[in-house]
């Protein structure tokens, strides 16, 4: 006679561990963040929580960090749920470090066997078991179980995981729970596996059930209404109170969870990372080889191959850094970065380190960074120190068009089993969340798209009723309200893993035993399942192999200058501190210049008036959220104004300049002055904050670095508050006034919004100066470099070309008889010796025209010129589509005449195929009327995105004048507060995070650019005009201060209809 199933646990709240839990890193399955699940398990008093995302360890570090923050007696188990191709579903839990490595490698095998976002594992992959891992067989959710098949599966798992396998009993408070429990206990008995309680949790709280339904519908590519039984029947797949579980599960099943926990000892803290060692030659140690390279680098830097002429201060810093690196064991890290930089330079690839690494004289000696230690701004503790609980971080920028060469070098040198890129977590933002929720709810696609197009990245809050009405939705409808609520809930959820912009992790042993590796979307790329924050949290080293478009533009520009001058010209040949460069920048003439071409930077330039290199360092750093929100900008500008008036800058002084009896107060009167003198008494950089904490508040250098880290975490975790009291007390003890102490704390808090290290700003300032010199002194080559390196920068080719022409650069159109693929320099006919070159636009600017076709044109033209379109098509093997694109761009004009004529010939002149291939077929030439100027403009913008003819608004000026619009040039001379109205093509839209909802527009007419400020209230009231207009009329009031002129918008009018078919696109929210 069969025994009755065990009764529920008699204890009201027995001890329990959840062994099967999915986070939202099981994409489109889990409905809670890892942090929420850990917090909920701790709150419910669980003994342990296992994070078991599907074929993934992507969420475990976040769970680990949350547990650290909570400091609660909850044990975190690491595992993964695997759904095999054969139908078996199993959860594996790692018991120790070796088992964790095997699990990570198994996940890697599954992920590498499939395309991005998928995995493929079979029973064969588990045939020998996974030593050290515990296995839970998870029955299907079917109401009627196939007992025989499940017994067979459970036995199979039990044989491969002897004494380490269980049958998971998951009950969901359904009407069949009793029958399901009885059946699962019988199956466990027949298979010889102990049963264990589990929830298969998808969310931390039942309130996430609606969101879980949305995710399930998205995964199945159906609406919620169509999903039917594929949706969970209730909200029970959550982390419940233990008392609830006690009523649901027999006591022995709950107790079994604790026996499993007792066998799991692995913690993520056990992960240890060793850097590659093969870069060290025989007979050398990492320390000795690094020292040799540094000594060679110092001699190279100082231009003396034999002697050591390093200044004593630099020599002392070298010895200090080498000792510190040796003590912390980071020699191999520096050697690896040096090897990548050496490879790049050997290939002629421009590169430069940046970030905190520019504080290191070792990085400078190795050629990784370019900031000269003689500048006197290096603070090595910002980069590496004994008290830092994190590894150093070296970021190196490479030319964006050639970075792939460096990436593939890493893969070749270390192998894919040891090197991979870090991940980036792509999260739902306002627009993507709205679209996906609306799709799951089955809302009308047309209305949904209208609403989605009106949402931007900054729309993180609830959808405003007026936006819903404009899209045709009723804001009072329960379904629409559900859309708004679920969209808000989904924003911030991970959507998928992408690849980091360049963060490489390279290991001495197998990387996939440290973290799973999967295929990236790009061919020949592999990505780990952890992102930058995960790596930092575990103290794992990475190298940032980053891409920077300006480096490509500089190399291309310098190559053109070299060719034009007939001798090599490099960055080292650019004259330093050229006065004409600073005059240009002080007039906000910086379109195309690295880092200082944005609206905010251009507004700052005439106020700051840079006159030397260090001014550029400040310029780069001061227009950042940290200094702005910390209130540093106006005090700094006021200090500069005092200097111009020969007035002194005051610095805070302690009231006890000498040590007292017990030695408590020992600051020197000029301590603060030495820190702040170069920024005129105002802290602009993170390093200055750290130095002030040391000299004014008594922090150790390591404590000061902890303060710096707390600045970065302030917005997320409020970690800065615990340092505030220490700062205030330390400064009071050293005799500084409370006013200065409070102001410094407020400024430090501002840095929580993102401020630059001084070393990073100095690295960027080098590129600012070089690009500014090229713009000022070699404008034609600079324009070519920028155009040949697109897409990059702040401005589209149209604005770059217009700006260069305003500076006197002659720009010649793209033509098949003269153009290469790239833009080139060309001597003008009858030009005098030494005259500036013109720019010949390249065929790459013709939208839709391919590089291979362009190279065939150049090769054929090199043999002999093209007499006509037919010959061009024949010899360059161009099809009708390619000829049509060239004709539409005006590139056939030298052979065919105007566009209509060219289009006619293109239609008839493509190279014959088949039996007629290579044959010359003569057709009569038609004579067509030339297109009007307006038609030419429309065609230019359609195929090129710009025009070399008159500006579109020049053709509309008469109409705009009747509407009483003035030009951009006219308002530059208007007095402050004068009412004005202008109309222009919208070239860019910006919304800085520090602007409190204000939007900044740049509009362009035939006379230049105008800056428009649209305050938050007007943005919401006239959202369609602000975000959708191509030709915008602005009614407003002038805001003028010196050379800086803005128009504060009061009313906006969309005049895009005046443009007709002309396509003018803007670069928005760059």
Swiss-Prot record:
Its main location: cytoplasm. Keywords: Cytoplasm, DNA damage, DNA repair, DNA replication, DNA-directed DNA polymerase, Nucleotidyltransferase, Transferase. InterPro entries: DNA_pol3_alpha_NTPase_dom, DNA_pol3_finger, DnaE2, DnaE2/DnaE/PolC, DNAPol_HHH, PHP_dom, Pol/His_phosphatase_N, Pol/histidinol_Pase-like. It is found in: Cytoplasm. GO terms for biological process: DNA repair; DNA replication. SMART domains: POLIIIAc. GO terms for molecular function: 3'-5' exonuclease activity; DNA-directed DNA polymerase activity. Its EC number is 2.7.7.7. It catalyses: DNA(n) + a 2'-deoxyribonucleoside 5'-triphosphate = DNA(n+1) + diphosphate. GO terms for cellular component: cytoplasm. Gene3D superfamilies: 1.10.150.870, Metal-dependent hydrolases. Pfam families: DNA_pol3_alpha, DNA_pol3_finger, HHH_6, PHP. DNA polymerase involved in damage-induced mutagenesis and translesion synthesis (TLS). It is not the major replicative DNA polymerase. HAMAP family: DNApol_error_prone (MF_01902). Belongs to the DNA polymerase type-C family. DnaE2 subfamily. This is Error-prone DNA polymerase. It comes from Aromatoleum aromaticum (strain DSM 19018 / LMG 30748 / EbN1) (Azoarcus sp. (strain EbN1)).
